[in-house]
């Protein structure tokens, strides 16, 4: 027989319970009609900790996916990735998930020059004996677009929003000279 170990009732009427069902820890949310084993919850958490973006000319990043890694596949066309409306606490990580250097470009767009980028990106260019490293910075007052040209394996970009502006930190691997550019709307 299952034994309820914990029960927590939230202020809005939502509740969850934890029980021991013959040595298996299970969790139930709200009504308690569906019990989920602890190992299933761990698998679910892993499955939802990342998003694979679509191979399309545009991709809308949602606030609901804040905190998740977005895997960008080898694209068949340049892609504009539109960040959500600025809100404090939003954060995203984007990584390149292709098997070879992408022939396409990424553009991250905040949607407004008032929601400009702060921070910087480093580019490593592997085709000149691997000795080309350049750091890029936005202008700090209006650059609301970041273009990343032909990313390769190891490329990642992180964004953190303070409610108005987007802080960016990134490492771009690309054999394209000047593979990072900034622009206004």
Q: Language-model features: where?
A:
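Structured beta-strand segments within beta-sheet-rich domains
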Residues: 131-155
């Amino acid at each position: 027989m299952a034994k309820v170990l914990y029960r927590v009732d939230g202020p809005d009427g939502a509740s969850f319970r934890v029980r021991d069902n013959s040595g298996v820890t299970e969790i139930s949310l709200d009504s308690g009609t569906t019990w989920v084993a602890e190992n299933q919850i761990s698998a679910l958490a892993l499955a939802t900790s990342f998003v694979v973006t679509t191979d399309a000319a545009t991709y809308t990043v949602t606030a609901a996916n804040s905190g998740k890694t977005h895997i960008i596949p080898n694209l068949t066309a340049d892609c504009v990735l539109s960040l959500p409306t600025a809100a404090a606490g939003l954060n995203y990580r984007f990584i390149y998930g292709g098997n070879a250097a992408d022939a396409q470009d990424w553009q991250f767009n905040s949607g407004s020059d008032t929601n400009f980028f702060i921070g910087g990106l480093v580019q490593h260019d592997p085709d000149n004996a691997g000795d080309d490293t350049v750091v890029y910075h936005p202008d700090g007052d209006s650059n609301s677009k970041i273009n990343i040209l032909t990313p390769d394996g190891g490329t990642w970009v992180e964004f953190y929003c303070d409610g108005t502006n987007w802080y960016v930190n990134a490492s771009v691997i690309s054999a394209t000279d000047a593979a990072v550019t900034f622009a206004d709307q």
